[in-house]
């Protein structure tokens, strides 16, 4: 059994599972049904949400690019390095009002020094991340790149990112 997490099992962008869901997941497990929590979040953040049943369920993290169960990565779907490089360069060119994270199997890489954004990643999403000078210089498998803008990224997505990358990356 698979379920989305944010907005379904927990309020959006919070770290706590609705208490009644823990019991429901335990009931599924007792019946031999494997529960999989699916989210765009990173694995560490999802595991914190399900901390009471963390070793009993499967995780589908990073928008499906990271599947994890019982201490093992079952599937990792990496971005093509050339696409990742071009996307990062494009996001850098947008200026400091846009933040981005580069997701790896071990957490996120961030170039930003923006304290508000870093605090949101650490205390809001409870992400594991490393601040680096250049995300592209790191020897990591890139699973996902996410962009953040305090207001909205809708216009950027619709007018810039989707026309350029929509058919190439998901």
Each language-model region and where it sits:
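Asp-based phosphoryl-transfer active-site loop
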Residues: 1-14, 87
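Short, basic/glycine-rich phosphate-binding loops at helix/coil junctions
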Residues: 3, 66-69, 136-140
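A short local structural element in Rossmann-fold oxidoreductases
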Residues: 10, 47, 158
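Short, contiguous strand/loop micro-motifs
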Residues: 11-12, 74-75, 144
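Short, surface-exposed acidic/glycine-rich loop or hinge patches that mediate macromolecular interfaces
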Residues: 15, 40, 150-152
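Substrate-gripping "pore-loop 1 plus following alpha2 helix"
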Residues: 15-20, 145
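Active-site phosphate-binding/coordination module
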Residues: 19-117
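Conserved acidic, metal-coordinating active-site core of Asp-based
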Residues: 90, 97-170
């Amino acid at each position: 059994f698979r379920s989305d997490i944010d907005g379904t099992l927990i309020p959006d962008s919070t770290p706590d599972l609705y208490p009644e869901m823990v019991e429901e997941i335990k009931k599924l497990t007792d019946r031999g049904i494997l529960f999989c929590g699916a989210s765009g979040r990173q694995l560490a953040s999802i595991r914190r949400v399900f901390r009471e049943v963390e070793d009993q369920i499967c995780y589908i993290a990073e928008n499906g690019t990271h599947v994890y169960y019982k201490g093992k990565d079952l599937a990792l779907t990496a971005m093509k390095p050339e696409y990742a490089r071009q996307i990062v360069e494009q996001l850098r060119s947008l200026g400091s009002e846009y933040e981005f994270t580069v997701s790896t199997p071990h957490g996120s890489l961030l170039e930003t020094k923006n304290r508000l954004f870093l605090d949101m990643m650490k205390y809001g999403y409870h992400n594991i991340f490393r601040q680096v000078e250049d995300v592209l210089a790191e020897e990591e498998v890139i699973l996902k790149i996410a962009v953040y803008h305090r207001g909205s990224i809708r216009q950027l997505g619709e007018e810039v990112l989707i026309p350029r990358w929509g058919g190439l990356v998901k």
